[in-house]
Amino acid sequence: MKFKEELVKELIANSNREMAIPMENYMKNNFSFLGIKTVQRRTIFKSVYEKHKSEIKSNYRTITWELFQEKEREFHQCAIDLIQKEIKKKFILEDIKLIEKLIITNSWWDTVDFI
């Protein structure tokens, strides 16, 4: 999937280990971070999203799950941004299973509160 590949590439290219350390500490070292602040992460996400809309529209559930399985928290946050953007328009009953998986995978207040 080109969207996920490009998003991963862009986020890693913009990682900042100095910023990651306090982020990890804030989350009690439960997750690794790339060190990308929210505004920058959302800018990167939006840029990559715009290039791959057609792929995303038909595969957003799979992409969301794949991003949520990545190690760094920024990927989980992008997964939340993606599902928030898409699920409102196309919610089906089976999405509850995906939402349940997201709640129990890498769960912590920052993602569970949204879900």
Can you say where each PLM-predicted feature lies in the sequence?
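Alpha-helical scaffold domains
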Residues: 1-115
